[in-house]
Amino acid sequence: MPSSTSPDQGDDLENCILRFSDLDLKDMSLINPSSSLKAELDGSTKKKYSFAKKKAFALFVKTKEVPTKRSFECKEKLWKCCRQLFTDQTSIHRHVATQHADEIYHQTASILKQLAVTLSTSKSLSSADEKNPLKECLPHSHDVSAWLPDISCFNPDELISGQGSEEGEVLLYYCYHDLEDPQWICAWQTALCQHLHLTGKIRIAAEGINGTVGGSKLATRLYVEVMLSFPLFKDDLCKDDFKTSKGGAHCFPELRVGVFEEIVPMGISPKKISYKKPGIHLSPGEFHKEVEKFLSQANQEQSDTILLDCRNFYESKIGRFQGCLAPDIRKFSYFPSYVDKNLELFREKRVLMYCTGGIRCERGSAYLKAKGVCKEVFQLKGGIHKYLEEFPDGFYKGKLFVFDERYALSYNSDVVSECSYCGARWDQYKLCSTPQCRQLVLTCPACQGQGFTACCVTCQDKGSRKVSGPMQDSFKEECECTARRPRIPRELLQHVRQPVSPEPGPDADEDGPVLM
């Protein structure tokens, strides 16, 4: 599998070392060169042989790395292979070179194949019409095999989350890039995820791709490598654009890949509001300073700055920035109407926007900017996810809601929400116990023990009446408490800051989210 950056001509050891700076790749004498493989290559690809061999070796060694309790503090590395534990680079390198030459050979051949495709693609792109690059860089058929990594040298169990030696992982990413053939990308992504045993959800549109996938760490690493080497995305994506968290394939019930009009459902055509005119990106460090400055003001209500949470109410309910304005909306597709209804609130204001991973702010900030009422519009690059990686004990309090079966990620010990029934501090969502309901509910163990497991009194009553028949689990209906909920709230011109401690306990009929 190729590097995210195609190597220059000649010996590309430097690129390989930059990509795997923790490995000593200079001494390759232990690997027997495959003269037959090299002899079969054309001139341009043959020049990449040295790079491919070193890259194959580095990738193989990297997959054998195991975490240690002290690795975070002192960069200690251990490797496990063939039921042996290796404590230094020299010993693991010697073992791989002498015992796994065949695997290195096959992986080298695979990398060379991918490099040949990349070289051909680059030549096609340079001569193609700039408005239609996809027609030149991808096959006209839906044969996606050229962009699937070779996994023959890996233990099959290593690709399956929970069965390998490492804990699984969940990736969250997006990439805005005009796509000529979203259907081809959809077919490729489906094949790629199935190939790597990944589950999750991926939305593809003419404006780009938005995905969250889970699997083993080996599988997610290979997925990132392929994405970074893919011609259409490699200039717009970098490794830091992939947010990672503990998890795996079990975090999603299945793999869903589809083509839509938008990669994040705001409900407005990208032709009307484009991602190309967003608010100014602030790094987590820059955003932290802006929030610190905002919170240090004696009277935030009189400030010219608004800290705006672009997420849904059930997300901000269990975690949010101090002093934020958190709209009481159920879907992101309600956000444009929320802005329209509360436009005066944003007039002559500096707006600091944030969301989970940054994607909603891209077009949400573009929509707010297009209204022409704000002084400035900023957005948190990488979203809360990246902010918490740098500032786990910063100004964001509580948990980070995620759209998978984990429901939330914890970076600090703060609990900012409460049980819907008794008002005790609680922030762990569960599905409403009524089979036909779509809601999430906050109910503490004590209340659960008393049978309070539904999102509202109406659902609690429905749950006590058993429903029989084949449609019991598949039929869904909107909860009555959702139907009664105001769709678009109107804020006071001097909005009330969200506190960092739990709010007063809600009425028993307060609803939870519709899962999307």
Curated annotation (Swiss-Prot):
Q: Which residues form a coiled coil?
A: none
Q: Point to the regions of Acidic residues compositional bias.
A: 506-516
Keyword set includes Ligase: no
Q: Quote the gene name from the UniProt entry.
A: TSTD2
Locate the active site: 355
| Post-translational modification Phosphoserine, affected residues | 269
Which key words tag this protein in UniProt? Phosphoprotein
Q: Which residues form the Rhodanese domain?
A: 301-396
Task: Spell out the residue ranges making up region: Disordered.
Answer: 490-516
Kindly provide the name given to this protein in its UniProt entry: Thiosulfate sulfurtransferase/rhodanese-like domain-containing protein 2
